Swiss-Prot record:
Keyword Membrane assigned: yes
Domain CHCH: 36-77
Protein name, UniProt field: Cytochrome oxidase assembly factor 4
Pfam families xref list: CHCH
InterPro entries named among the record's database cross-references: CHCH, Coa4-like
Record-annotated disulphide pairs: C39-C69, C49-C59
GO-annotated biological processes: mitochondrial cytochrome c oxidase assembly; mitochondrial respiratory chain complex assembly
Misc. comment: Present with 907 molecules/cell in log phase SD medium.
Motif, Cx9C motif 1: chain positions: 39-49
Function in brief: Involved in cytochrome c oxidase assembly or stability.
Motif window: Cx9C motif 2: 59-69
Domain description: The twin Cx9C motifs are involved in the recognition by the mitochondrial MIA40-ERV1 disulfide relay system and the subsequent transfer of disulfide bonds by dithiol/disulfide exchange reactions to the newly imported protein.
Keywords tagged on the record: Disulfide bond, Membrane, Mitochondrion, Mitochondrion inner membrane, Repeat
Length: 96
């Protein structure tokens, strides 16, 4: 039975690493930028999954968790991205 979301080993490992980053008095620029998205743990869990499996298809649960976090924290509006259909996140907002 496969683990999902916040119960995955990747998520648990990412959460532990995030606790260490928060205690760091001089975090690097990358950690600071990712932390500001509000999705540091979800991002790291996805990276850990891909690094171990080498196959994004095996990381659907981590991807779904990251996507949910990204949207919940308003990052689609803050950062311009391009969707599969070629529209940007800013184009999507204009249509609303």
């Amino acid at each position: 039975m496969s683990e999902t979301g916040e119960t995955s080993e990747y998520y648990k490992q990412a959460l532990e690493e995030y606790k260490e980053v928060q205690e760091d008095e001089d975090p690097d620029v990358w950690d600071t930028r990712i932390s500001k998205t509000g999705c540091y743990v979800e991002n790291l869990a996805l990276q850990l999954c891909h690094a171990e499996t080498g196959d994004w298809r095996q990381c659907f649960n981590e991807m779904a968790l990251f996507r949910k976090c990204w949207e919940k924290n308003g990052n689609r509006e803050r950062v311009s991205t391009v969707d599969v259909d070629g529209t940007t996140s800013k184009d999507s907002e204009k249509k609303k």
